[in-house]
Amino acid sequence: MSVTCFEQALQIMRIRGSKMDFESRRQRILDKMEDNSIAILYSGIEHHVSADEYDLFTAQANRNFFYLTGLRRDNMVLVLDKCVEPAKTMLFIEEADPTMERWYGRKVTMEEAEEISGIDEIEYIYELESTLDRIMTREDVYTAYFDTYRHQKVDLPDYNVVKANEFKTDYPGVAVKNLFPL
C-alpha cells in the first residue's frame, strides 16, 4: 500500500509539533490578549498568475498561523475569542470538493485538522462571516488582533493586513492591533 504525498505531509506535521504544543501556544496568546478581544489569523490565499491560473506551488501559509495550528494550507482562518468565558478557539477550513481536489490537491478534513491542531470547534470557511457577525453583535468586542507585521514599509501587505483593513471599515468602533508582539 503506497502512501500519498498528502499523507506523508500529515505525518511530518504530526512529528514537528504535537496538539499539546499548539494548544499551549494558543493559550499563551489568549493569556496576553486583552479581555473582550478577538484574534483573527488568516493562513493566506493562492495568488493569480494569469486570468486562469493560480500560483499553487509557491503559496505558503502564514507562519504564525502554522505556529498556532500546525496546519500549512491556504484558505483557513483561526479565531481566538476572549469575549466569552472560557475563551473559545475556532478554526475555519475549506470544504472538500472532489472535482477541485482532482486539479488542485486534497484538502484537509475536519478530523485531520482537529487531530493536527487540537482544535475541536471546526467549521467550513463559508461560515466565517456569519460567525464573526454573531460575535460582533452579541459580544462586547473592544479589540481585534490581526497579524499585521511587515518587515519593511516597502513590503507588500499580506492577506492578513488586507483583511484587517476590511475589518476596520466594517467595525470602526473596534480597535485593531497587531498580534505579532504577543
What are the roles of these predicted feature ranges?
Residues M1-L182:
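A composition/biophysics-driven feature that prefers long, compositionally simple stretches
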